[in-house]
């Protein structure tokens, strides 16, 4: 009875972990940024403060325009139904936010691409590992194999560790690697009242929750494998 309960909750936590990892991996809301500034001198733009909204993930970086007095800068502005009907997108790997013009030959750009490369590799390894863990657990269930349960549990723990590194690296990226101060100063040459507001998006927030469920599932499956091994003697 206790073994069945452990398998049930292990499977439940594993399913939640896989779902959260895949959603975080596949959606483009790890970073949300709002640029505000009155730069245009056109008469029709007089008295209005324009805003550009950016959201970025593993695959894409997208942006769309809006009006500050019509929309606030909260996270809800980036929800699907609140976005502009048309927006521009580019690959996030070679053009991460903030994208400074004429920087492709600079050392900072090269460092950013290399850092994003490591982050990308860890993200892919985490997704592959958790899919392999799920496959091992599915194979273990019909045969009650303690080896497969232990292997699956180990892979879930490894996936949790990899995604923990992904989260930590992204925090370091936003806080240190992304040259927001230089980007803001460059923009202020054209727009003296320019300001940029950056926050973590809901895709980023799902990743630590997925890490928790993956680690919990991994430990449960290790205990299940040990219990099956002891009962088989």
Curated annotation (Swiss-Prot):
Q: Which organism is it from?
A: Gallus gallus (Chicken)
**Region (Interaction with ITGB1), start-end ranges:** 52-62
Give a Pfam family name: Claudin_2
Q: Kindly list the cysteine pairs connected by disulfide bridges.
A: none
Q: What is its main location?
A: membrane
**Keywords noted in UniProt:** Cell membrane, Glycoprotein, Membrane, Myogenesis, Signal, Transmembrane, Transmembrane helix
**Intracellular or extracellular location(s):** Cell membrane
User: Which superkingdom?
Assistant: Eukaryota
Q: Which InterPro entries match?
A: PMP22/EMP/MP20/Claudin, TMEM182
| Cytoplasmic-side segments | 139-153, 225-233
**Keyword Ion transport listed:** no
As for family, the record states: Belongs to the TMEM182 family.
Induction remarks: Up-regulated during myoblast differentiation.
Q: Where are the transmembrane segments?
A: 118-138, 154-174, 204-224
Protein name, as recorded: Transmembrane protein 182
């Amino acid at each position: 009875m206790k073994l069945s309960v452990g398998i049930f909750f292990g499977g439940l936590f594993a399913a939640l972990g896989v779902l959260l990892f895949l959603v975080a991996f596949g959606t483009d809301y790890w970073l949300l940024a709002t640029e505000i500034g009155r730069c245009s001198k056109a008469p029709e733009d007089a008295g209005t403060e324009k805003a550009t909204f950016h959201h970025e993930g593993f695959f894409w970086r997208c942006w769309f325009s809006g009006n500050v007095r019509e929309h606030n800068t909260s996270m809800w502005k980036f929800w699907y139904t609140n976005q502009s009907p048309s927006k521009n997108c580019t690959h996030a790997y070679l053009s991460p936010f903030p994208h400074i013009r004429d920087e492709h030959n600079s050392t900072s750009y090269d460092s950013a691409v290399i850092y994003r490369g490591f982050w990308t590799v860890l993200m892919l390894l985490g997704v592959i590992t958790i899919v392999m863990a799920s496959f091992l657990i599915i194979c273990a269930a019909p045969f009650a194999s303690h080896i497969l349960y232990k292997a699956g549990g180990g892979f879930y723990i490894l996936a949790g560790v990899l995604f923990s590194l992904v989260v930590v690296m992204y925090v370091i990226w936003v806080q240190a690697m992304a040259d927001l101060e230089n980007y803001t100063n460059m923009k202020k040459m054209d727009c003296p009242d320019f300001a940029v507001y950056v926050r973590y998006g809901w895709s980023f927030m799902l990743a630590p929750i997925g890490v928790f469920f993956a680690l919990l599932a991994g430990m449960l499956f290790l205990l299940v494998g040990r219990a099956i091994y002891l009962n088989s003697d």
